[in-house]
């Protein structure tokens, strides 16, 4: 009998809760995800393996009808997909009538309003590995096999499925020039390690070039060869020379046996046997790589020994030698936008994947991260944003191209008849930041089914509803006149402190906005920029960044984010901001016009931050608010602590604050008596914060740490904003009852506990806003604060209203730093920080077209766009020749 399963009427949700005591101890499970106990306990959502078992069972066969199909071969279309025995048996275009009267017994899934995409294929993953990913003792570890350490109980598998990932290549780390053999896994939850292994997948092996195998950042004494790039080249020379000789030895032996002789067989060497497999083509090389010089070296070395590199992994400078990679025939698998975390990553550009594709290279986006793999659709979408890549080509970078790189292009990676039914149902376009996976199917069986632990699915939570409903511009916008006016006319204006204004106008005079509305009268001498079809937004404010203090992660000489010596309240970042930092222009291109540049380490009292704009030639030109906040990293308190006593470092903080207050009393008394002030710059700097006269950024992440930080702030009578609060969702009501604001981040990160809901970090902002907590959002990404809009977009996708998400990175961020009167919204009288885009500010596919800071239009070029232009010209020059 035919069964119908209508996704539009049956929402797959499970609400659950767990009691979270003052000491983060599980005391009691209460019904209702948001119940509040009468005693001193709080409840919060959780997940168990039992909850993760899908309720939808297909038996490997189903019909998914009237769904928007993204085949990864052509633009999306409305149609129906039939699955039988775990395989796709039919893909038809056009709307279908109800199949409820059919008689073949297949489960019917109504996909109306939904999107069906191929499962994501991550060609570079370390998920599901037990006991570490590296074997660092030797330079060559080809005898090792990652399949020996597969962990089927790694919760990362389930969370990857929640992001639509169906296949991964499980790789060793990059400690070895020639590492161990890899394994391709089909992700399933609740199965054995053997059941994860992709049957008959080609054998791969991990190579590595550059800083990692030569141990540049290992620290301590390095005595393992090689320690240079020329040494790595020698490893390949020597290893494959020996492998050739090994093969010749066995060939001679086999020939002698064939002639009836009884020779002594050569000594079997698993390591050399694997290398011989590379030479013979049965083992495929996937090589970690960064710099163009080492990439070329490996290609030439492979050609010298007669084999082909299957994929260059990471390949951050691949765009520099794109033509050579294409000629060799290697595929490339890169990050979407990671850069600068070490010196060999400093020339990475977000156009890399697209430029390699343009050269004819089989190009993919990989994760190398349990978090990044959860949104690889969106990572691929960034190539649309930064390089104008076609959307189908972008989708292929997360699906079909990866299948081909793994030698599985005829079995997975696209929605085609005959391929495995590895499918993902989403409620929006897979490249959209606003899409959520509804279920993930592997071999025709549902392996992930979306839970809704927080009751937020398609919610529209806001802590400022009046801003979303009040009238936009005044009925009769004020007329403006005068020379030097600039008007942006005809675009959709998103003011942040009110609803959007279609066909709106923003007028700038000097550094200020002088009018915003839908019918502003303009004088004849006003300069006009046509914004028709475009969107105008307030410039975003990136809170708690190292912008200007940090250049390259692995190079200490470029890092001024932290200081030694414990508590340093008088230290300010202001004069250390480097105006020529490449990060400034790279960050600006996402629509970020201001940052709060903050100390990032040391402490617990780390020092004072400053607010800077991202357009200036000296630190004095950049800084717009000096010493805006004092940053304190509240000492961590374990969630399973046995008592609520202050840790020793908290007691020390209390003592220091009291010392600062005493210093102020004594200094005031001295002044009253005509005496010289007491000379202590540390206490002088700390006193206004200790007395609640200035605001403190109190960093606290874990639930118990948050509770301790709030008690500390309350008892010390401090003016604080909580920063981080990654487990704020566990204690949202407590934060609300304290009346505190929070800066949430990172949003794009994995939950701390295996039993936290898979979406707890994504939904954190919405849970807090629902409780009435004023929120701002930060990226918490030293290398990529430019990804702030995507963090806000994810928060919006997981329950926060779009208006509230916009305010979280504009107006609320301005409120945090005390600059809401001049920044954070497109409002007459405020500074003219304006961003023009071709679409939704938070979408990964949206392009930022133009920007103004203080009324001055700023360049949209940066170090990365310059490199892109330079090497794109090289590519086309090579093609022309």
Q: Where are the language model's segments positioned?
A:
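His/Asp/Glu-enriched, well-ordered alpha-helical/loop segment
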Residues: 53, 131-133, 139-144, 284, ...
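C-terminal cap of metal-dependent C-N hydrolases
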Residues: 67, 79, 416-459, 489, ...
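Histidine-rich, glycine-flanked metal-binding segment
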Residues: 46-60, 69, 73-117, 497-539
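Bacterial N-terminal signal peptides that target proteins for export
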Residues: 4-22
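Bacterial N-terminal signal peptides
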Residues: 20-31
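N-terminal pre-domain segments of enzymes
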Residues: 38-59, 458-482
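Polyanionic/metal-chelating signatures
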Residues: 161-309, 432, 436-437, 442-452, ...
């Amino acid at each position: 009998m035919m069964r119908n399963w209508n996704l539009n009427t049956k929402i797959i949700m499970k609400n659950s809760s767990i009691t979270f005591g003052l000491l983060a101890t599980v005391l009691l499970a209460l019904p209702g995800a948001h119940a509040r106990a009468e005693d001193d306990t709080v409840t919060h959502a959780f997940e168990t393996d039992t909850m993760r078992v899908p309720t939808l069972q297909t038996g490997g066969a189903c019909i998914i009808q009237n769904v928007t199909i993204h085949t990864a071969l052509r633009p999306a279309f409305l149609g129906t997909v039939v699955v039988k025995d775990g395989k796709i048996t039919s893909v038809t275009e056009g709307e279908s009538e109800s199949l409820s009267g059919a008689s073949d017994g297949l489960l019917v899934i109504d996909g109306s309003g939904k999107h069906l995409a191929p499962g994501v294929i991550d060609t570079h993953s370390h998920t599901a590995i037990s006991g570490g990913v590296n074997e660092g003792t030797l330079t060559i570890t080809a005898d090792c096999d990652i399949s020996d350490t597969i962990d089927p109980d790694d919760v990362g598998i389930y969370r990857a499925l929640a992001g639509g990932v169906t296949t991964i290549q499980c790789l060793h780390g990059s400690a070895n020039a020639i590492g161990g053999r890899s394994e391709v896994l089909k992700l399933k939850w609740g199965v054995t390690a053997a059941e994860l292994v992709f049957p008959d997948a080609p054998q791969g092996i991990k190579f590595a070039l550059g800083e990692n195998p030569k141990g540049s950042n290992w620290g301590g004494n390095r005595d393992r060869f090689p320690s240079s790039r020329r040494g790595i080249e020698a490893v390949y020379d020597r290893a494959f020379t020996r492998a050739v000789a090994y093969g010749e030895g066995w060939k001679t032996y086999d020939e002698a046996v064939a002639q009836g002789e009884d020779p002594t067989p050569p000594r079997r060497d698993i390591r050399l046997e694997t290398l011989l497999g590379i030479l013979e083509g049965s083992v495929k090389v996937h090589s970690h790589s960064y710099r163009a010089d080492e990439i070329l070296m490996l290609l030439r070395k492979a050609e010298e020994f007669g084999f082909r590199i299957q994929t260059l992994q990471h390949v951050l400078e691949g765009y520099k030698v794109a033509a050579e990679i294409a000629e060799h025939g290697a595929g490339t698998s890169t990050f979407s936008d990671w850069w600068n975390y070490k010196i060999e990553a400093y020339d990475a550009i977000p156009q890399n994947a697209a430029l390699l594709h343009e050269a004819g290279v089989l190009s993919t986006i990989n994760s190398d991260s349990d978090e990044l793999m959860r949104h690889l659709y969106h990572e691929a979408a960034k190539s649309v944003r930064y390089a104008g890549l076609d959307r189908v080509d972008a989708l292929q970078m997360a699906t079909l191209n990866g299948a081909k790189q793994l030698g599985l292009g005829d079995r997975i990676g696209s929605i085609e008849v005959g391929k495995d039914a590895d499918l993902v149902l989403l409620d929006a376009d897979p490249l959209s930041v606003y899409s959520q996976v509804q279920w993930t199917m592997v071999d025709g069986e549902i392996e992930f089914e979306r839970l809704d632990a927080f009751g937020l699915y398609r919610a529209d939570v806001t802590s400022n509803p009046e801003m979303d409903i009040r009238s936009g511009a005044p009925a009769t916008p004020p007329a403006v006149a005068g020379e030097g006016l600039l008007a942006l006319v005809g675009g959709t204006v998103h003011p942040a402190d009110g609803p959007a204004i279609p066909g709106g106008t923003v007028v700038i005079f000097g550094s200020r906005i002088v009018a915003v509305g839908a019918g502003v009268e303009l004088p004849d001498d006003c300069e006009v920029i046509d914004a028709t079809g475009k969107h105008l937004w307030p410039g975003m404010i990136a809170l708690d960044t190292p912008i200007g203090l940090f250049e390259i992660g692995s190079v200490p000489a470029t890092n001024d984010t932290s200081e030694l010596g414990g508590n340093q309240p008088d230290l300010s970042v202001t004069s250390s901001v480097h105006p020529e930092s490449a990060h400034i222009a790279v960050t600006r291109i996402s629509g970020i016009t201001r940052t709060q540049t903050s100390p990032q380490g040391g402490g617990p009292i780390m020092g004072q931050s400053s607010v800077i704009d991202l357009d200036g030639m000296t630190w004095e030109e950049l800084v717009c608010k000096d010493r805006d906040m004092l940053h304190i990293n509240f000492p961590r308190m374990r969630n399973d602590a046995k008592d609520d006593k202050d840790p020793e470092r908290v007691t020390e903080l209390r003592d220091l604050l009291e010392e600062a207050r005493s210093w102020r009393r004594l200094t005031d008394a001295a002044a009253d008596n005509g005496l010289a002030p007491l000379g202590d710059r540390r206490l002088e700097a700390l006193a206004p914060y200790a007395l609640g006269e200035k605001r403190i950024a109190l960093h606290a992440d874990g639930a118990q740490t948050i509770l301790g930080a709030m008690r500390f702030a309350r008892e010390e009578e401090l003016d604080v904003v909580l920063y981080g609060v990654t487990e704020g969702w566990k204690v949202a009501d407590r934060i609300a009852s304290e009346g505190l604001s929070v800066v949430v981040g990172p949003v794009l990160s994995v939950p701390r506990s295996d039993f936290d809901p898979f979406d707890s970090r994504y939904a954190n902002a919405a849970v807090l806003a629902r409780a009435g907590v004023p929120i701002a959002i930060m990226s918490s990404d030293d290398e990529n604060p430019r990804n702030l809009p995507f963090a806000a977009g994810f928060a919006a996708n997981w329950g926060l209203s779009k208006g509230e998400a916009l305010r979280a990175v504009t107006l609320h961020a301005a409120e945090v730093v005390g600059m809401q009167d001049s920044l954070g919204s497109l409002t007459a009288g405020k500074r003219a920080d304006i961003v023009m885009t071709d679409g939704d500010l938070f979408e990964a596919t949206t392009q930022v077209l133009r920007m103004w800071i203080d009324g001055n239009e700023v360049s949209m070029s940066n170090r990365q766009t310059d490199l892109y232009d330079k090497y794109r010209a090289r590519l086309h020059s090579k093609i022309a020749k």
